[in-house]
Curated annotation (Swiss-Prot):
One of its GO terms (biological process) is regulation of monoatomic anion transport. It is found in: Plastid, Etioplast membrane; Plastid, Chloroplast outer membrane. The chain crosses the membrane at residues 22-31, 56-65, 82-91, 98-107, 121-130, 138-147, 153-162, 169-177. This is Outer envelope pore protein 21, chloroplastic. It comes from Pisum sativum. Keywords: Chloroplast, Ion transport, Membrane, Plastid, Plastid outer membrane, Porin, Transmembrane, Transmembrane beta strand, Transport. Residues 32-55, 92-97, 131-137, 163-168 are chloroplast intermembrane. The gene is OEP21. InterPro entries: OEP21. One of its GO terms (cellular component) is chloroplast outer membrane. Voltage-dependent rectifying anion channel that facilitates the translocation between chloroplast and cytoplasm of phosphorylated carbohydrates such as triosephosphate, 3-phosphoglycerate and inorganic phosphate (Pi) depending of ATP to triosephosphate ratio in the plastidial intermembrane space; in high triosephosphate/ATP conditions (e.g. photosynthesis), export of triosphosphate from chloroplast (outward rectifying channels), but in high ATP/triosephosphate conditions (e.g. dark phase), import of phosphosolutes (inward rectifying channels). One of its GO terms (molecular function) is voltage-gated monoatomic anion channel activity. Belongs to the plastid outer envelope porin OEP21 (TC 1.B.29) family.
Length: 177
């Protein structure tokens, strides 16, 4: 199980996040995620997805359900405590032969349980991985653009630490345990 501590500028509360992937077959797995808000002691998110990887296309597709009191980096729904159905897709294009620089397009759509409220997201990003940036230190830099919100974003990852920020001033920090 993967666990992390997360703190976002808009939440003012530390969250504990856990994720487990259970392999169904070679390229398919069942993924369960959950989050706990340490300020309220209540669940802040949860999801269950079936994800399939298409190795010939360097792409993934996921279908499942999710529950979020607050969706990704500060994007909120009108009513926050509904179950939502979700579809996710991602395609990676290597930019360099060594695979350290990639261009990725990704998208997703959530719909509430009554099929009345839709929320789409999608974007494109460049990712650059630098192994052994310094001794025992790997770094990843992502620069992208979220198309539906029309906002550029940045991610810097160093071993267990990840910092995310966007042009609207939203940010969060994650530490993987």
């Amino acid at each position: 199980m993967e666990t992390s501590l997360r703190y976002g500028g808009d939440s003012k509360a530390l969250k504990i996040h856990a994720k487990e992937k259970l392999r169904i077959d070679t390229n398919t797995f069942f993924q369960v995620r959950g989050g706990l808000d340490t300020k309220t002691g209540q669940p802040s998110s949860g999801s269950a997805l079936i994800r399939h990887f298409y190795p010939n296309f360097s792409a993934t597709l996921g279908v499942g359900v999710r529950y979020d009191k607050q969706d990704s980096v500060g994007v909120r729904y009108a009513k926050n405590d509904k179950l939502r159905y979700t579809v996710l897709a991602k395609k990676t294009f290597p930019v360099t032969n060594d695979g350290l620089v990639n261009f990725k397009i990704k998208g997703g759509c959530d719909v509430d349980q009554d099929f009345k409220e839709w929320k789409s997201r999608g974007g494109a990003e460049f990712s650059w991985n630098v192994f052994n940036f310094q001794k025992d230190q790997d770094v990843r830099l992502r620069i992208g653009y979220e198309a539906f919100e029309q906002v550029p974003y940045l991610q810097i990852r160093e071993n267990n630490w990840t910092f995310n920020a966007d042009y609207k001033g939203r940010w969060n920090v994650r530490y993987d345990l």
